[in-house]
Design a protein with these regions (language model features):
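Conserved NTP-donor binding/palm subdomain of two-metal-ion nucleotidyltransferases/polymerases, i.e.
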Residues: 2-137, 143-364
């Protein structure tokens, strides 16, 4: 079976290599590779941290360091890093304690009303690892089919403010305006075939004890699939840096928890939802930090090279557009006319790429 990567253009191969270096810097790659080892030595950690300053690092680097401190108690970080690590742990705990009562309440209400549901993403990881101090911005819960609207009516009557999007509705605390729980009618993975996944998730879901109730979560393989697609989305949209870091540790846990993943399930999910190419991009990026995670040749034989090239173009244009639009300032445009023309060029491109997923197959 030929390796489909050789069917990519040189510029696409170069971009994937370049993108890996944009997503993870050199020290982050060293730390993540080290963190995936069963046991690490103090000398190995000190070597990886050489020249790195946690106070100047972004949220991704700090989150990686925090996870290492929790998963590898056999090593210790420099004393000047401990305040930052403690602050991260405190933030995780405070946020979780804010969300937990609503999390449990929503589960109990859905159970009492006989509505089907599955906990997704970070919320599901909290069910799998209730004592692990993981940052959880909000809880994502899948309530598919006709049960979706019934659930929204129930929570609206219970006083929650609703914030609707295409695939989900956020429940906000009316007192604080904070987002607490997202109710999904289907898993938001960026394709029109996403609805097909709901039935597959339900058929393999696990029921686990959680707090004072039980919760239904995707099996480890389905969790891995959703995580990989979300990783590609986060990379493309330049969002959730700490989520990208957490995802690496989530993947390792899920593989260890299952005692060995059934990769045919992950492939089946990708084919069902038409996200094979997105998984391939995630795999290529994550191989730099999780070299032994994926089986050899995973997903390669399912790749449509033409679709992959288009998706790489979409990823490239979206990232470039977001960077330019985010950093644009009128004062800068006055000083530099080329930045103004670049702004409008990418604004038009970004409109079409995001809304109609047109794949502009040209050099940036």
């Amino acid at each position: 079976m030929p390796d489909n990567r050789i069917m990519l253009r040189i510029k696409d191969e170069f971009y994937l290599t370049e993108l890996t270096q944009e997503v993870f810097d050199e020290v982050e790659i060293k730390m993540l590779r080290l963190a995936m080892s069963p046991v690490i030595t103090q000398a190995e950690l000190d070597s990886a941290l050489c020249g790195w300053d946690i106070h100047k690092a972004g949220s991704k680097g700090q989150t990686i360091a925090f996870n290492i401190s929790k998963t590898h108690p056999e090593v210790s970080f420099p004393k000047e890093y401990l305040n930052v690590l403690h602050r991260i742990g405190l933030s995780c705990r405070e946020r979780y304690l804010t969300i937990l009562p609503h999390f449990v309440k929503v589960i109990k209400v859905l159970e009492a009303k006989g509505l089907d549901f599955i906990i997704l993403k970070g919320g599901a990881m909290r069910v799998y690892r209730p004592d692990y101090p993981r940052w959880t911005a909000d809880i994502d819960i899948l309530v598919p089919g006709s049960h979706y609207k019934k659930a929204l009516d129930i929570f609206k009557n219970k006083g929650y403010s609703l914030f609707k999007s295409i695939h989900s509705t956020g429940l906000k605390d009316p007192a604080t305006g904070q987002s607490l729980v997202d109710i999904h009618r289907f898993v938001g993975i960026g394709t029109i075939k996403a609805k097909r996944l709901s039935r597959e998730l339900a058929g393999r879901a696990l029921t686990l004890k959680f707090s004072s109730t039980t919760a239904i979560v995707p099996c480890p393989e389905d969790m891995v699939f959703i995580s990989l697609v979300n990783f590609w989305k986060n990379v493309t949209d330049i969002t959730s840096e700490n989520s990208m870091a957490n995802l690496c540790f989530d993947l390792k846990f899920l593989k260890d928890y299952s005692g060995g993943l059934n990769w045919d399930i992950v492939r089946s999910d990708a084919r069902t939802t038409d996200t094979v190419e997105a998984l391939y991009i995630s795999k290529r990026l994550l191989e730099a930090v999780l070299p032994d995670f994926f089986p050899e040749g995973f997903i390669d034989e399912d790749i449509d090279s033409s679709k992959l090239r288009k998706l790489i173009s979409r990823t490239r244009y979206t990232r470039n557009s977001i960077s330019i639009l985010r950093d644009f300032s009128l004062l800068g445009a006055i000083k530099n006319a080329s930045s103004l023309s670049q702004y409008f060029f990418y604004r038009v491109k970004f409109f079409f790429v995001k809304r109609f997923h047109l794949m502009f197959d040209k050099d940036c």
